[in-house]
């Protein structure tokens, strides 16, 4: 399943890029579906920054998935490679549940548009429900779309609310 979202931010690209990369933890109060973000690792090297962040989400688990997904499992690793030379961020999301069954990755482009920035988020999510503990083989085909929709339902709005949160953060730190 494709993930595609665009956000226009009323700040210059260099400010948006650096703030998105460096101030993510400070955005949590502005992110309604996120409980916390933990920076686990950061490596800076000649215009490229590699990061590992752990995101902890808020969200209701669908009834059909409650026997499989526990509330403490609704978090994910965010592996990111920020490249300032081409204003991109390659990312890979690894959920704490169904790690071997879920593949999610993509690339964000920070596009300059005058004094503003357009953040283009592009990615792909794939789920294989076969082999997930607790999922009967005969139901795997029916449950996979529910789980996929749940994960995309958590990720996509958060991708856009991060941009909204970033604008609120930048607005509150002007001057």
Regions found by a protein language model. Give the residues of each.
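Beta-strand/loop substructures that line and gate deep hydrophobic ligand-binding cavities in soluble
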Residues: 51-52, 76, 81, 90-149
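A conserved amphipathic terminal alpha-helix motif
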Residues: 84, 137-175
């Amino acid at each position: 399943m494709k993930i595609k979202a665009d956000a226009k931010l009323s700040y210059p690209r260099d400010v948006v890029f650096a703030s998105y990369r460096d101030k993510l933890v400070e955005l949590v109060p502005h992110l309604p579906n996120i409980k916390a973000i933990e920076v686990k690792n950061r490596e800076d090297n000649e215009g490229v920054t590699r990061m590992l962040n752990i995101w902890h989400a808020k969200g209701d688990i669908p009834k059909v998935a409650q026997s499989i997904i526990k509330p403490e499992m609704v978090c994910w690793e965010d592996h990111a490679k920020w490249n300032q030379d081409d204003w991109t961020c390659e990312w890979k999301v690894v959920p704490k549940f169904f790690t071997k069954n879920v593949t999610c990755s993509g690339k964000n482009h920070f596009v300059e548009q005058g004094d503003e920035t357009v953040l283009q988020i592009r990615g792909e999510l794939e789920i294989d429900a076969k082999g997930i503990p607790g999922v009967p083989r005969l139901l795997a085909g029916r449950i996979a779309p529910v789980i996929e929709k749940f994960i995309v339902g958590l990720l996509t709005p958060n991708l856009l609310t991060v941009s909204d949160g970033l604008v609120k953060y930048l607005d509150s730190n002007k001057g």
